[in-house]
C-alpha cells in the first residue's frame, strides 16, 4: 500500500508516486505510479 501510506502531495512533489516508483524499481520494473490507491508498475 505504497500509495496509501505516503499519500500527500504538494505543488512541487508527490511523495506517493515516488515511493511507488521506487517500490517497482526494487522489484525489477522500470518504474510506476499511483492510480487511486493502487501502485501500478511499468514493465
UniProtKB/Swiss-Prot annotation:
Induction of synthesis: By bacterial infection.
Disulphide-bridged cysteine pairs: 3-34, 20-39, 24-41
Gene3D superfamilies noted in UniProt: Knottin, scorpion toxin-like
UniProt record, GO biological process: defense response to Gram-negative bacterium; innate immune response
Record's subcellular location: Secreted
A single GO cellular-component term on record: extracellular region
Source domain of life: Eukaryota
Secreted found in the keyword field: yes
Chief site of localization: secreted
Keyword terms of this UniProt record: Antibiotic, Antimicrobial, Defensin, Disulfide bond, Immunity, Innate immunity, Secreted
Function: Antibacterial peptide active against Gram-positive and Gram-negative bacteria.
Entry similarity comment: Belongs to the invertebrate defensin family. Type 1 subfamily.
Stated name of the protein: Defensin
Biological source species: Palomena prasina
Phylogenetic classification of the source organism: Eukaryota, Metazoa, Ecdysozoa, Arthropoda, Hexapoda
Amino acid at each position: 500500500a505504497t500509495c496509501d501510506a505516503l499519500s500527500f502531495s504538494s505543488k512541487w512533489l508527490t511523495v506517493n508516486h515516488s515511493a511507488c516508483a521506487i517500490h517497482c524499481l526494487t522489484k525489477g520494473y522500470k518504474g510506476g505510479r499511483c492510480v487511486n490507491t493502487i501502485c501500478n508498475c511499468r514493465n
